[in-house]
Swiss-Prot record:
It is found in: Cytoplasm. Disulfide bonds: none annotated. It catalyses: RNA(n+1) + phosphate = RNA(n) + a ribonucleoside 5'-diphosphate. The keyword Phosphoprotein does not apply. One of its GO terms (molecular function) is RNA binding. The gene is pnp. Its cofactor is Mg(2+). Its EC number is 2.7.7.8. Its main location: cytoplasm. Keywords: Cytoplasm, Magnesium, Metal-binding, Nucleotidyltransferase, RNA-binding, Transferase. This is Polyribonucleotide nucleotidyltransferase. It comes from the Bacteria. Mg(2+) binds at residues 480, 486. It comes from Borreliella burgdorferi (strain ATCC 35210 / DSM 4680 / CIP 102532 / B31) (Borrelia burgdorferi). GO terms for biological process: mRNA catabolic process; RNA processing.
């Protein structure tokens, strides 16, 4: 089928035939093979879907060999993890928990044309492979990418179109509606985002219908059996009578930890009571806990839908109290602490040089990133113990926050620093990624990064039943877990910069999404107003602890002069002035260092190297060679002048003589003397090779030969 500029082709039955399902998807010149397998072991106690998605890209797909010492693909790159999450999130809710087997989906990029991104191809290959397999799956689903460029929407754009666009989103969904949206933007309005999602759904329906036709022809009609039937705790009514009234109070205790403690006490009390009645066994213990969870979910959702009261006492559109502070760490380049209710993020900005850029070696081509955001979620943030490690969740949340901020960060030409923002989540009760956006934005301003505007983020939720729904602003962790939709919106006062949405139900209407986006916009403006009372514009100047930068522009044909033979000249500048020198192909030179005076001297040295000499200019040169007629003085690595050492009258055609009068020589380090018996002649001072002397250009002939004279200190 034709989707955008190219045909999307699905093939099956000739590759990976031993898998439960396999599909080779091709779009343009990009091909991805997706397989799905399930284990033979069945577990009846699972209350989740044991799904793993391992998207991977092979270097041979782009005709490349991996860089570095190890010439084999290694652990998953961040990009592969992010694409795996894009595949996992819309697909996971469509598996039946009662299947009871581990499921593994492996999309492998086999070819890429460097024009069409393989991630969308991989998503559709994975969705189709699962749909055609014998694993129970409530499909079909499909995905497309939409961008907004020059006032038009483009489906499945090229890399170049993505780079130039104002909106870039990936949308997944079914025939009935949208299930996932993720992307970034350059301050676009809510209407543009909604139109992009609407347009994407039309293409998604085309792909879903093609999958259904494919299933009718080659798919496995007979599905594997479910491992168990859903069971209900046989004493559920008795449990309701025993605990429901107390649970209604416990669900609304103030404070996350206090609320969790109250609910846990009731759970334990109920467990002990039913155990004493010998109504709990190993076979129904999990059913007891599920029934208890169902009561909690019922109480919370009913309160929101019918009474507009949330577990912490807020109304649906109310945002938790916000406290912000900047510059709390004295030696860092920029820092900010953002606290919203029981969620707290500390963001620290560090400025570096081009040497600190992140080098990306992947099949889409080598890239250098000068803006990075890293998100850390330590176990103490939720009052637990655990390992300090970076998991898929941390990478995904960090990527979302980075996309929300990166359109506001200046380009390298305007701000030639490498920027790294690290977010440490110190407390978490919902929306830690959006707290990271807020803290990160203020931290950038604190560091003096000239961002285009302040960015705030907010997490929204949805509770629905039939045609009735309530949109929640600034959701808690439990509202995320018990709700029907989780979507995060980040942006400035002018528009959206980052967006992520996961929908757990079908038939989410356009009107509902419009209401949710408008409520998110109002919440975002409220948060921005509070942040702006702390810091509203970037600091003028950067931290004294950050590396200093001096820039200059030279002619391209003079780059070799600055570098010198085998890098000798640039190395000498680096060593003498303790600076780092970055030379770009367009003739732009950037100096990095810690000492302003030395940086300025280094700049002057480079300017003297590339400057065309003029009569009257003064240089501090080096004596390179001496002969019987005079000395050759190196003015720059590419320019030499000649200093005559022949006897000269005091008054020459140059006025005071090429070497000046005897008084001038007597003032030049004791050099210059009258010739005995001939007061009209003077002898120049003695020179040695390697000696540094101050000279003045007095003549340049038509062949470029430079004549010099010595200059006294007071003339320099």
């Amino acid at each position: 089928m034709k989707i955008g500029r190219d045909e999307l082709v699905f093939e099956t039955g000739f590759m990976a035939k031993q898998a439960n399902g396999s599909v080779l998807a091709t779009y343009g010149g990009s091909s991805v093979l997706a397989t799905v397998c399930c284990s033979s072991n069945v577990r009846e106690d699972l209350d989740f879907v044991p799904l793993s998605v391992e998207y991977n890209e092979k270097y041979y797909a782009a005709g490349k060999i991996p860089g570095g010492f190890i010439k084999r693909e290694g652990k998953p790159k961040d990009k592969e993890i992010l694409v795996s999450r894009l595949i996992d999130r819309p697909m996971r809710p469509l598996f039946d928990k009662r299947f009871g087997r581990e499921i593994q989906v492996i999309p492998t990029t086999l070819a890429t044309d460097q024009l069409n991104p393989p991630d969308i191809v991989g998503m559709n290959a994975a969705f189709t492979a699962v749909f055609l397999s014998d694993i129970p799956f409530n499909g079909p689903i499909a995905a497309v990418r939409m961008v907004y460029l020059n006032g038009k929407f483009i489906v499945n754009p090229s890399f170049e179109e993505i780079h130039d666009s104002d909106l870039d989103i990936v949308v997944a969904g079914s025939l009935n509606g949208i299930t996932m949206v993720e992307g970034g933007a350059n301050e676009v309005g809510e209407d543009i985002l909604l139109s992009a999602i609407d347009g994407a759904h039309e293409y998604i329906k085309q792909i879903c219908n093609a999958q259904k036709e494919f299933l009718d022809i080659v798919g496995k009609k007979e599905k594997l059996p479910l491992a168990f039937e859903e069971k209900i705790f046989e004493f559920k009514d008795e449990l309701r009578d025993f605990v429901y009234a107390d649970l209604k109070e416990a669900c609304f205790v103030k404070g996350k930890l206090n609320r969790d403690k109250a609910i846990t006490l009731l759970r334990n009390k109920s467990y002990e009571y039913f155990s004493s009645l010998e109504k709990l066994t190993d076979s129904n213990e999990s059913l007891f806990h599920k029934a208890f969870d169902d009561f909690e979910k019922e109480i919370v959702r009913s309160s929101i839908l019918n009474d507009n009261i949330r577990t912490d006492g807020r109304t649906p559109n109310e945002i938790r109290d916000i406290i912000s502070e900047v510059d709390i760490l004295s030696r860092t380049h920029g820092s900010a602490l953002f606290t919203r209710g029981e969620t707290q993020a500390l963001a620290v900005t560090t400025l570096g040089t081009s040497i600190d850029e992140q080098i990306m070696d992947d099949i889409d081509g080598d890239k250098r990133l000068n803006f990075m955001l890293h998100y850390n979620f330590p176990p103490f943030s939720v009052g637990e113990t655990g390992r300090l490690m970076t998991g898929r969740r941390e990478i995904g949340h960090g990527h979302l926050a980075q996309r929300a901020l990166e359109s506001m960060v200046p380009g390298k030409n305007d701000f030639p620093y490498t920027i790294r923002v690290v977010s440490e989540v110190l407390e978490s009760n919902g929306s830690s990624s959006m707290a990271t956006v807020c803290a990160g934005s203020m931290s950038l301003m604190s560091a003096g990064v000239p961002v285009k505007g302040q960015v705030a983020g907010i997490a929204m939720g949805l509770i629905s039943e039939g045609d009735k729904y309530v949109v929640l602003s600034d959701i808690l962790g439990e509202e995320d877990h018990l709700g029907d939709m989780d979507f995060k919106v980040a942006g400035t006062k002018n528009g959206i910069t980052g967006f992520q949405m996961d929908i757990k139900i079908e038939n989410v209407t356009k009107d509902l999404m419009r209401d949710a986006l408008e409520q998110a916009r109002i919440g975002r403006i409220h948060i921005l107003s509070i942040m702006n009372t702390v810091i509203s514009n970037s600091r003028v100047g950067i931290s004294k602890y950050a590396p200093k930068i001096v820039q200059l522009q030279i002619d391209i044909d003079k780059i070799s002069l600055v570098i010198g033979s085998t890098g000798k000249t640039v190395k000498a500048i680096t060593d003498e002035f303790e600076v780092k020198v970055q030379i770009e192909q367009n003739g732009k030179i950037i100096l990095f260092g810690d000492d302003d005076f030395k940086m300025q001297k280094a700049k002057e040295r480079i300017e003297s190297i590339v400057r065309e000499p003029k009569v009257g200019e003064i240089y501090e040169g080096t004596v390179k060679k001496i002969n019987s007629f005079g000395a050759f003085i190196e003015l720059t690595p590419a320019k030499e002048g000649f200093l005559s050492t022949r006897l000269k009258p005091r008054d020459s055609k140059y006025g005071s003589g090429r070497f000046g009068n005897s008084n001038r020589y007597s003032r030049f380090g004791g050099g210059g003397e009258n010739i005995r018996g001939n007061a009209g002649l003077v002898r120049p001072p003695k020179l040695e090779e390697g000696q540094r002397i101050k000279v003045k250009i007095i003549d340049i002939d038509k062949f470029g030969k430079i004549d010099l004279e010595i200059v006294r200190d007071k003339d320099y």
